[in-house]
Swiss-Prot record:
Gene Ontology biological-process entries: methylation
Annotated SUPFAM superfamilies: S-adenosyl-L-methionine-dependent methyltransferases
Protein name: Putative S-adenosyl-L-methionine-dependent methyltransferase Mvan_0104
Gene3D superfamilies attached to this UniProt entry: Vaccinia Virus protein VP39
GO terms for MF: methyltransferase activity
EC number(s) per entry: 2.1.1.-
S-adenosyl-L-methionine in keyword set: yes
UniProt KW S-adenosyl-L-methionine keyword: yes
Length: 309
């Protein structure tokens, strides 16, 4: 059970789960500026810059990482791993959407979209509708920030400002969603913030709303042993104290329920053809795997994709 979460908690872009979206956007911004990037997200930097001051400022700051590494030599590879992971994850799910539209799907739903800019940066075919579901304040920040820079969506983008713990299927339908049309669903950076029963309920709702031929993609986090979690917590606490950085412990926001269902197995049992790709395999394939202390196969996440039968 997460110690910082409550059943009806809310957040904006600078607090709680919302702040993690800024950290992910910072990693995408850093990747975009690499010589040979895996992704191109020209809007990530804009979204990070408008979010104010926070721990996310240091994710892509090579100078800061170098200073921290002098104090803790294992931190450098860990920060590099974190940035590489976000790049590989984004690349994987970009490819998922490309395959979906190539198959003729024109209805997209991004769950807990955060600062995801795919509705603005991907080359969607004519007639594509992208629904984004998230907390009202998060969606409002993204829309207003990008609009102030003259950024326009490349699809028919529709906001669904609602918490996924509420009746989001009704809100989605009111926004124009058509359950008779095949849909491509994405749950990226989401499941770890849901209790096990809420995850099952989410996929049951997706299944009910999905016409045959629909597709779903999801990221599920690996298992982190309690002692490893404690070591990481102590390490980052030391960094924040030593370098006067605003503390942010993501593990306090997530749920590591031991009885959480395996996503691919759940989908297979409920009418989907599912495939699971260990994230370390994808990182290795793209030459982005960084060896880190305390790393093992169980600690890596899994990328699952499925097609509705």
């Amino acid at each position: 059970m997460s110690s910082l979460r409550t059943d009806n908690d809310t957040w904006d872009i600078a607090s709680s789960v919302g702040a993690t979206a800024v950290m992910v956007a910072a990693a995408r911004a850093a990747e975009t500026e690499r010589p040979e990037p895996l992704i191109d997200d020209p809007y990530a930097k804009i979204l990070v810059a408008g979010a104010g001051n926070g721990a996310w400022q240091y994710i892509a700051d090579d100078g800061f990482v170098a200073k921290v590494t002098e104090s803790d030599p294992e931190i450098g590879p860990l920060f590099e791993h974190m940035k590489n992971y976000q790049a590989v994850r984004t690349h994987f799910f970009d490819a998922f959407f490309a395959a979906a539209v190539d198959a003729g799907i024109r209805q997209i739903v991004i769950l807990a979209s955060g600062l995801d800019s795919r509705a603005f940066r991907l080359p969607w075919p004519a007639g594509t509708t992208v629904f984004e579901i998230d907390q009202p304040l998060v969606l409002a920040y993204k829309s207003s920030t990008l609009a102030s820079h003259g950024v326009q969506p490349t699809a028919d983008r529709r906001e669904v400002p609602i918490d996924l713990r509420q009746d989001w299927p009704t809100a989605l339908t009111h926004a124009g969603f058509d359950a008779d049309q095949p849909t491509a669903w994405l749950a990226e950076g989401l499941l770890m913030y849901l209790p096990a029963d809420a995850q099952d309920r989410l996929f049951a709702q997706i299944t009910e709303l999905s016409a045959p031929g629909s597709r779903v993609a999801a990221e599920s986090m690996g298992i982190h042993a309690q002692d490893r979690r404690e070591r990481m917590r102590e390490r980052f606490a030391s960094i924040t104290a030593q370098f006067d950085v605003e503390p942010m412990d993501i593990t306090e926001l997530t749920y590591e329920d031991p009885d959480r269902a395996d996503v691919a197995q759940w989908l297979t049992a409920h009418g989907w053809r599912a495939e699971a790709v260990p994230s370390q395999d994808e990182m290795r394939r793209l030459h982005r795997l960084v060896e880190i202390a305390d790393g093992d196969d169980q600690s890596f996440s899994t990328f699952t994709t499925a097609v509705k039968r």
